[in-house]
Amino acid sequence: MNNKIKPSILPGFMELLPKEQLVFNDIVSKITGVYEQNGFLPMDTPIIEKEEVLLAKSAGETEKQVYRIDNEDRKQVLRFDLTVPFSRFAAQYMSDLTFPFKRYQLGKVYRGERNQKGRYREFYQCDVDVVGNGNLSIKNDAFIINMASKALRKIGLDSYKFQISNRKILTGVLEGLNITNMQEVMILIDKYDKITEEQFLSELNKLIGEEKAKVISKVIKISGSSDEVVENLKKVEIKNEMLEKGIEEVEEVIKYLKLFGVEDSEYAINLKIIRGLDYYTGTVFETLLTGNESYGSICSGGRYDNLAQNYTENVLPGVGMSIGITRLFFVLREIGFIENYNSSLNEKYLIVPIGDTFEYCTKILNKLLVNGKSAEIYFEEGKLKKKLTYANKLDIKYVILIGEDEVTNKELVIKDMITGEQKKLNIEEI
């Protein structure tokens, strides 16, 4: 009887083999490098938070997806994003921070997502946020989208589009139509791309009636260039302060994006973008890969002016965005991007001793390491073919062969595993 347990992991969790993990780490390093270059400071928060802290502003779908820890003494939950813990952090350490406070954070988050392809229950997010004390310029909204642009370009992506909106626009329209069940309507609009047009209109008619549904449907379908969308929004017959403020803010964000150098082809105004999380108050955006829109957003964010009010009397408005690194990696792997990922990950050296040359090999190793190269010695015995196969399987580009002649002449033989080219070098030439 075989009583061995089959090694496996739970659905909704990602594990990578070392070759892919190296690429994953390289992507993270490039993204966080962009953040640091632009003045964002690193920080971290606990994976486990008090339930009353984490769920102070959450309801609906968000609360249903939270993982709770079974503990009789206190209610604890796993964080479902990095933004809410950041708001708690900003309120808790307010006297120690310099505002506007710009931070980035990489960490795992947990959501009880329905098990499906590309959706994970544990996943890495890589966030940037700016929080102000009392007020925060709208320029930051555009700057955050600019950070997303720089990060995606840094890892080699150039075919994507930021879908930008402002929650005040739809809130203003709904208020102008005297709609009371606003939250239900917002949730339905957020699902627009996941259901058919007929289903959407049918559900909307049930919620607010046919006449009002026609108005909402017409507004969210306004499209074209950013200038055209703004002009058409200004022609909407509903007039109120909330709607006008939303139009003004989205117009400003577009203006500053242009000044930051974000290309027109990188963004569009999409009034169907709501963002499911309950804390957004103004600018919201999602990011779709051009030609691969079915995979959903790879980078999302927005403005949250009231999130910290659950923890402090002080006004700490914020804006931020999150790149779902785990989801992004899955999508890039699916579309073949990872296969051809451009990095220096294979610029490695494997030193192979032939005969009694180990001492000399360690000198070569130390010289390479001092010069910032990635290198290792093959310690095990065996045929040369086996050692070269080892290098090939690990995508090691260069193999250095050290025999007794090389030790005598203070030389080495270096073999390029891609081209097959082999040449002798003096030790000083390394």
UniProtKB/Swiss-Prot annotation:
Keywords: Aminoacyl-tRNA synthetase, ATP-binding, Cytoplasm, Ligase, Nucleotide-binding, Protein biosynthesis. It comes from the Bacteria. GO terms for biological process: histidyl-tRNA aminoacylation. Its EC number is 6.1.1.21. GO terms for cellular component: cytoplasm. It is found in: Cytoplasm. NCBIfam families: hisS. PANTHER family: HISTIDINE--TRNA LIGASE (PTHR11476:SF7), HISTIDYL-TRNA SYNTHETASE (PTHR11476). Homodimer. Belongs to the class-II aminoacyl-tRNA synthetase family. This is Histidine--tRNA ligase.
